[in-house]
Structures are given as structure tokens and as C-alpha cells.
Amino acid sequence: MTSGDARRVARGAWCALVFLLGGCALPPFLREPVPPGRVTLAGTEVVVPARLAGNLLWVEASWEGAGPFRFLVDTGSSVTLVTPALAQRFPGRVRPSGPNLRLRVRGAEGGAIDLPRASLRRLELGGAAFEEVEVLLYDCAPLSAHLGLPVDGVLGFPLFRELLLTLDYPGSRLILRPRTLSAVIPGQPVPADAALRTPLVTVGLGERSLLVLVDSGSAAGFSLNPAGISPRYAVPPRDGALLGTLAGERPQRVARLAEPLRLGGQVIPEPVVDLTDELSALGGALLRQFVVTFDPARDRVFFHRPGEGAPVRMEVRSSGLSFTRTPAYWRVAAVIPGSPAAAAGIVPGELVVRVNGEPVGRWDLARFERLLEGSEPITLTFLEGSTEVEARIAAFNLLP
């Protein structure tokens, strides 16, 4: 591109590099759930403040005079991942050395990597304390760069299997209660199966029933494997963002269905789907409308939408660009074909160094997403050699 090029791209939700950590699975011989050595709560209900960034819920915690530490909550992961630095600070009985202490983990999109085993002596979330937590060690630097904030780990579903876990997306909080508590849970229960260490529920798609993973660690909305289903499309599949996974990157294919999705008593009309060849899943872009409660003692999940009205229609706002983020610059990783960005001549490899005049290091993902909610054009500054070129961008709906 030259400095005179017009760059009309997206306004709205950022089509950024999304790290799909959900769906992490262990080999079959390790699928028996391994809860922490002991879980204690300061009361019958522990409320942990949470934050939503890129459709992912994360929490912040401090204990033993150290922290704050930040963790993503990933119900789609059968393991808990932490950085080597955190494992060194709170070493447990399992140390990451010696034979047979590496495990192969398969990510949501089928790729696999080997990670060292270890354990944490203690992990606290507000008034909840977990002791002798088995973990795998993972470098969270790429995820930290994407979210624009330090990430110290990913909390998998088995960590909470001794608890009644509520992800209150609208209220930006986690609620932890004893699993034996006879609590009144809002919403309609959906039978669940956590035999493989992660929660699977049956949902309705049109006139069919479909088994899906409830995956808070996926930033997507509804990931659908169309094999054997022959879904009807209101808007046919098209290219979306470039998605980062635990084992690499893949291009996204998105579509809008012509039939509703039913979660218990909740009906989502014409849902947006991210097409996959792996297990179908409900991710953060859909779950964020609900208060989701996992009741492992009774094998059920509740979906409750606070307030009046039906679930809102799912939308996909896009800039036509995917970025790989660093504190100093954002590199264009991919351009969606047929988007305004592609028409403007933007190509992968170009570097963005400022947003609205501020260095990109000041823009975490949550702040950038809030900016994209508005209607005002956004000024991106590109670095071309030693020259800086400003471009004002707007946004479009990826799927009508």
C-alpha cells in the first residue's frame, strides 16, 4: 500500500487473533477426573469478580502475599494450565522433571502438543482455596499478547468438580458454592455428561438434537460440526478471521443458520456458527448472554438469561483484519477476502503502531472492543519503512 491509499475497513467487534484453548483433552488413560487435594470455601457462597475480554472470562487472585495473578476460566478444558513461573513460586508434590512427566494435550481444533506435568501447592480464588492442584505447564505469552494483559494460567473444568460453579457473564463474576448445597438455581436444567472431564449437554437445532461442549475457553459463539447434520443456512459459509489455537493457526469459516438453537427454555434465532470438524461447542460469544451454572453432583447445567426478553440475535462485526499482537505493534496476520480491508489493498505483514494516536501497547483487547462499539471512525497508524501512514477505518457486519 502507498500513503495515498484509502483504507476503509471495519467498525465493530474486532476480528482479531483468537486463542481457542477450550476443548483441551488428555489421553484416554488419564481421563478419570483428578480434583484438587482439598477445596475449602470461606462460606456457603464465594463470589469472585471477573472480567470479559474477547468473549473470555478471566479472574484475578492473590494469595500468600503474591500476585495479582490472572486466570482464564475454561470449562472446555480437561486440564489446568499455568506458567512455569507460577509453578516455581508455589511448587507442589509433582515436579516437572523426570521420565513420563510430559503429557500430550489435544486442542479444540485437533492439534496436539506435549506439556510438562506439575502441581501447585495452593491456588486461591477469593475465599476459595484449592490445595495440591495438578497442572500442565504452558507459556501463556501469546495469549497475554492477544488480550493485552498478563495471563498466568487457564483454569480447567476439573478444578471445580467439587463445587457448584456459576459463570455470571452479565454480572461479571464467578460464584462458587459447595456441590452438595440444595440451592435454588435460576433457569431450566439441561442434562449434562462430564465423563470425559468436560461438560457435554444436549441442545436442539431445528428439529434435531445435538451433543455439544459448554466451552467458556472458546471465544467463538456456536462451533458446529456439520457432518451428518446438513444444516440449513440463512447466510452461507464465508471466510472469517484467522484463529490461533493451542497448536497453530487456522482460517475461520462462519455462517448463519436458518433454524433456531434451543438451550433448555432459551431459543436463539438464526445463530451464527463457526464451522469445525471437531466436537460442536457453545463458546463465550454465545454464553455471554447467560448466567451458566454447572451442577456436577446432579449432572446438569442451567442457562438463565436475566431480565426480560428473549436472547438477542447473534452478530459478527468485523474489521476484515486479523492481528498478531505485541506490545510494540500489531501485525496484520490475515485479511478477509471480499472485505473493505481487502478492497483497500491491505495485506498481511503490515504493522499497526498506534490506535487513535495512542501506542498499541495502551490498548488491551477489552478497551479496543469498547472502542469498536461506537460509530466514530478509528484512526490506525501503519509503519511503512520509516514512514508512518494514518488510515481511518469503519466496520461491517460479516454476516447479515
Per-region residue spans from a language model:
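Bacterial N-terminal signal peptides that target proteins for export
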Residues: T2-W14
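Bacterial N-terminal signal peptides
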Residues: G12-G23
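Pepsin/retropepsin-fold aspartyl endopeptidases
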Residues: C24-P400
